[in-house]
Amino acid sequence: MATEQWFEGSLPLDPGETPPPDALEPGTPPCGDPSRSTPPGRPGNPSEPDPEDAEGRLAEARASTSSPKPLVPRPGPAPPRLSLDTLFSPITQQLRYLLKKADDFQSYLLYSRDQVQKEQLAKAMPTFLQMCEPYFLYLEAAARSIPPIYGPLQELVRKGLLEISQQLTLRLEQLVLMYASFGFVDLEEMNPLSISCFFCGRFSISLSHEVSIFRYCAPTAYTASRFPRYLYKKMRWHLEATPEAPGRGQDSLVDYYFLCYRDTWEDTGQSPANSCPQIQKLWSIGRWVPLGPAEDDLYSWILCPQPLGDYQQLLTIGFEEPTPTLATDLLVQILTGQAGQARPPSAAGPAGWAAQGS
């Protein structure tokens, strides 16, 4: 029948139309392109990938595995950086504790009627000053020692620590002077039981040199014999040099430096009675120059009430008293400026010591 013949053949396809899979003959490409025909002797399988595509993918896989890129670890979270307030919190707490103790000493002195208690507190004053020494040690060493220990924050930390050190220094000086004004404390330097000065810290300026700081509670004559005349000291520094080869019977060598002032009417030749009512004080930093007795004469040292020495002025500051922090800063500049220069014959230590710390 005609109808049966019409259904026996396949329907004509429109241009670009793909026949269904079951209507394709073996070896016939889907798009009818003769260039993409199946090679002879190999049955066509529409589910297999094209050889050219497979080779391209294989080449890409080889390229990706032949030169693998190194794995770069992602930067982890930065460690938390302490703020200055957090860093200074335990330091300021200790400062408040020591200032509170100083206020207690002052309150008992001013408001207590118990004379025995006041005398006992005066005897406890040296112990209280010694209790402050470890705190001073930390403040000055952390602020000034070389190399710095706080990295980029060193300058900010240095300023804060030195302000705290100066605040406590002036408070202790005021407290000792107040007890001395009531007659409970002696400021005479010749008295071994007096509190003429107290320790304010220590720091290193090189690998073999350390500086210790002392503050006089009141201006004190430079020597007991009052020579040089009209010269009074307010601060003292010990420059201790450790020998390069310790353990061979060599002791540390110590130089002494002072913050002093000199009454200016001495230069005019006038006596204090004929001078102006307001006497100006010319401040300077100098070094102790020993005059005697000889270092190897032990008998002379025993009979000598006080060593003789002169004052070698190294820096003239002016008529305004420097703060304790500024005075120590100026001394450090003087000491570090001596690098590579010959020291005076009476000075201890090798020349050019500051270069050792560089």
Curated annotation (Swiss-Prot):
| InterPro entries registered for this protein in UniProt | DUF3314 (IPR021748)
Q: Which domain of life is it from?
A: Eukaryota
Residue ranges annotated as compositionally biased, kind Pro residues, are 17-32, 70-80
According to the UniProt record, where is the region Disordered? 1-84
What PANTHER family does the database record attribute to this sequence? UPF0575 PROTEIN C19ORF67 (PTHR36292:SF1)
* Family per record: Belongs to the UPF0575 family.
Name of protein:
UPF0575 protein C19orf67
- Read off the lineage from the record: Eukaryota, Metazoa, Chordata, Craniata, Vertebrata
